[in-house]
Amino acid sequence: MAETPLVEFDNLHVTFPTSGEHVQAVRGVSYNIMPGETVGVVGESGSGKSVTAMSLLRLNEMMGAYIPQGHIHFNSRDHGRIDLSQAESSVVQDIRGKEISMIFQEPMTCLNPVLSIRTQLTEPLFQHQNMEPEAAEEKIVGLLNRVRIPDPRGKLNQYPHHLSGGMRQRVMIAMALACEPALLIADEPTTALDVTIQAQILDLIKDLQEEFGMSVMFITHDMAVIAEMADRVVVMYHGEIVEQGPVDQIFHDPQHPYTKKLINAVPRIGSMTGKAAPEKFPAVA
């Protein structure tokens, strides 16, 4: 018997009303995310990859967007198989942060600057699991330890501005995992970090995925990250899917010209020689 997808986008369309017209940001998107699988969604800015992801949690509605056509089926632990595009707001609110969590590319703008780390990490536990404060604190200390934050208990009374960018991203990951979600959406989670910290965060996400057994929807414009993280790849361009398939197939036998350009855009050591290489600046005396 075939395994049921955790998430199934079926001919999804997302439209944003603007002055005088309606802009179709996503058009006819269809793909699945299986339990325990990492699906990499890749494309340039404006391709519709983040809009598709935010449709899962109905976050686009805050900006006036609506879904005129299509479905988003989700295998919920508590609500059964439901269509998130048509579910009651209360159901989506219950799933948000509990069964589907999201981490973003700039944690400083996503963490509340006036709330302590303790307050922000315990909120989903109070809301979704009705935990007592003492039990919630013990759980978040354990989570901070799992995301490799040194002296986790000592960080609880600190605020986001006390932490480095890499530490803030680890706090975001801990918050996203607090209720042990079935799906983690990672929307460009390493873009604002330096290269060394990027590698650490990617390794951390992979380790935590294996530990929690969750699926990951990894959104990026970086094909090198996709090659490292994804089992399958969905390539988006101008709100549509132009190609999708297993990661090895996409990298070794890409069919669409846009996919080929994305792969060729990945820098390779020694790939630029002669006239193709950029001019070197003169040495400083």
Over which residues does each language-model region extend?
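A short, proline-enriched helix->beta-strand linker immediately N-terminal to the Walker B motif
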Residues: 178-182
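ABC ATPase NBD coupling module
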Residues: 78-101, 119, 127, 249-254
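Short, glycine/charged-rich "phosphate-handling" switch motifs in NTP-dependent
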Residues: 232, 244
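A short, surface-exposed alpha-helical micro-motif characterized by mixed small hydrophobic
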Residues: 226-228
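Conserved ABC ATPase "signature" region
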Residues: 73-77, 134-154, 263-264
